[in-house]
A protein has these predicted regions:
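Secretory targeting signatures
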Residues: 1-40, 44-47, 52-58, 68, ...
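A short beta-strand segment in extracellular, disulfide-stabilized domains
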Residues: 45-60, 156-179
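Solvent-exposed loop segments of extracellular immunoglobulin-like
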Residues: 61-69, 180-190
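Solvent-exposed segments in extracellular or luminal domains encompassing
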Residues: 83-94, 207-225
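C-terminal edge beta-strand
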Residues: 85, 110-117, 238-249, 393-395
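Conserved structural position at the C-terminal beta-strand
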Residues: 101, 232, 380-382
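C-terminal edge strands of extracellular/lumenal beta-sandwich accessory domains
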Residues: 236, 252, 307-327, 366-400
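Acidic, Ser/Thr/Pro-rich low-complexity intrinsically disordered segments
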Residues: 266-342
Length: 400
């Protein structure tokens, strides 16, 4: 009898143990936050009677059984269920669409406003005016195309300011945009000054309203490459967009300054700084940077250590380029003194030596021959004992 009671007790104990997970059961309940997200197509210029496809597949959390309820007309009643749905609106106007997503224990909703326009309305055409500077900083013609290319010429900078940098303002013009029909008009001009960055956080990086107006001034623009967008809306509520590349190239020069001589066993250097952009994800990539140094072959104040020798008076200045980690990328030291006629060096009394930094140098790869973008420095280096009056240094940042 005792053995039977013991067996019965063990059986009951095992049954209770097996049912332990069935009671009090919060452990398996989903604790992740519900995030309701939906898109719709077409996203713009939706016409009365047109079928609109709604999709909530981006709602979170992924991998969890969710339910979806749609209210398409703002009357707080459910018009459709399911992760996808379609709807149409017979009348022109604005409609609020609500999506409610639930995991059975909690829910979250989101709303969007749709503008429905007349089925016969004509869309506008957005058109950003392209243009280029007439000349670059050398007086050469600048190519034109379906882009904006502006040269900034910061010539004859002070020798106490050895940074190649400047900010300018440029004009953006949409006067060639059209409303769609002769009896319509353009009611809104919205400019997005960086179509890769979602400034308003609505999930669309190309629809930010940074500036408004048919013609606007874009201020505080530094050398670089930019992609901007324009969205216009006509009186019927239809929209159209255009985008364009903007290139700001730059040149700075320093004229008639002194370069000290190496009288202590260490070369004398002058540093000139410039900022380089090479960001492929943002589409801001420099094409090349160039340093151009012109100096007299022989300094007028030079005295030979050995009278009549002349070797001591033959100048040789070099350009050395360093990235922001102070790693040297390249230099001109291997260019012989009788080979220094780069560019338009038309004087027999001067040396002209150029240092070109291609875009490849500014990439950020695993290769030992690339150095990244950011703050760079060009150093003028004098290894020789005599000082020298330099005629000019030019730094060009070419983005187109």
């Amino acid at each position: 009898m005792g053995a039977m009671r013991k067996a019965t007790f063990l059986a009951v104990l095992m049954m209770i143990s097996g049912l332990a997970g069935c009671f009090g059961g919060d452990e398996d309940e989903n604790t992740e936050e519900i995030v309701a997200v939906f898109t719709y197509s077409p996203a713009t210029n939706i016409r009365s009677g047109q079928t609109i496809d709604f999709d909530a597949r981006d709602s979170l959390p992924a991998g969890v059984a969710l339910t979806y309820k749609w209210d398409f007309d703002g009357d707080n009643s459910i018009d459709a269920t399911g992760r996808t749905a379609d709807w149409s609106y017979p009348e022109v106007g604005e409609y609020t669409v609500e999506l409610i997503v639930s995991d059975g224990s909690k829910s979250q909703s989101t709303t969007k406003t749709l503008t429905i326009v007349d089925a016969t309305a004509l869309p506008p055409t957005a058109d950003i005016t392209s243009y280029s500077s007439d000349e670059d900083c050398e007086g050469e013609d600048v190519d034109t195309g379906s882009y904006i290319h502006v040269w900034v010429c910061d010539m004859d900078k002070s020798n106490t300011d050895r940074t190649a940098d400047s900010e300018i303002s440029i004009e953006l013009d949409a006067e060639d945009s059209t409303s769609g029909s002769s009896d319509d008009y353009i009611s809104k001009y919205h400019w997005d000054l960086d179509i890769e960055f979602d400034a308003d956080g609505d999930g669309d990086p190309a629809n930010d309203n940074d500036l408004e107006g048919e013609t606007v001034e874009w201020k505080d623009l530094s050398p670089g490459e930019y992609e901007i967008g324009l969205t216009i809306t006509n009186g019927k509520g239809l929209t159209d967009s255009d985008d364009i590349k903007v290139y700001i190239s730059y040149a700075a020069s320093w004229l008639d300054f002194e370069m000290g001589g190496n009288t202590s066993g260490s070369p004398v250097e002058l540093d000139f700084e410039f900022l380089v952009h090479y960001d492929q994800d943002r589409g801001n990539t420099i094409r090349k940077a160039v340093g151009e140094l012109t100096y007299p072959k022989i300094d007028g104040d030079c005295t030979d250590i050995t009278p009549g020798d002349g070797n001591n008076c033959r100048a040789k200045l070099d350009l050395h380029a360093f990235n922001e980690e102070d790693e040297e990328a390249t230099n001109t030291s291997n260019t012989a003194v009788d080979q220094r006629k780069d560019g338009d060096c038309n004087s027999d009394d001067n040396d002209c030596v150029h240092l070109t930094l291609s875009s490849y140098l500014f990439t950020d790869s695993e290769s030992e021959s690339t150095y990244g973008d950011g703050e760079w420095t060009i150093k003028i280096r004098n290894n020789r004992v005599n000082d020298l009056q330099v005629e000019s240094l030019v730094i060009r940042l070419v983005y187109k």
